[in-house]
């Protein structure tokens, strides 16, 4: 059964182009991060990032046992909000925090450093991480959940299939 009657779109961002200057790519990432935190009164039930927290709570029953690896994290996306909101809830329940790790093929280290200084449960991988071949990063005592926040438009069908295959083979869950 096909749910959609149109073909999958492979969209590009200006920042993805080889001719795009790094400063513009970083600015583009910052704007996209702000969109995750945008709340439209009367139209939405909180920001998209806060709404995503509900998905975590429903599908990952023991959040404290996870390390969440944000693939294609850009300038941080929803991860700072996810960390803050989810860990407030865990703390109120007397549970330990869930850890978050930012990664990207083009790491935005300056922004990630700023985030991790404010939020002790957010760390980052300074070297490039190719979403098509991600090794396991979680400690052996932790489960690993990979999150893919509006990033699949960067990939063709073959790469997208490889990314999901990698997540199935080397992580415990993905969203």
Language model: regions and residue ranges:
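Conserved class I S-adenosyl-L-methionine
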Residues: 173-175
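Class I SAM-dependent methyltransferase Rossmann-like catalytic core
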Residues: 1-70, 75-77
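Glycine-rich phosphate-binding loop signature in dinucleotide/nucleotide-binding domains
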Residues: 62-63, 138-142
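Class I SAM-dependent methyltransferase SAM/SAH-binding core
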Residues: 66-137
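A conserved beta-strand element that flanks and buttresses the S-adenosyl-L-methionine
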Residues: 146-147
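A short, conserved alpha-helix within the catalytic core of class I
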Residues: 155-170
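Hydrophobic adenine-recognition pocket in adenosine-nucleotide-binding enzymes
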Residues: 151
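Short, well-ordered alpha-helix to beta-strand connector turns
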Residues: 142-143, 170-171
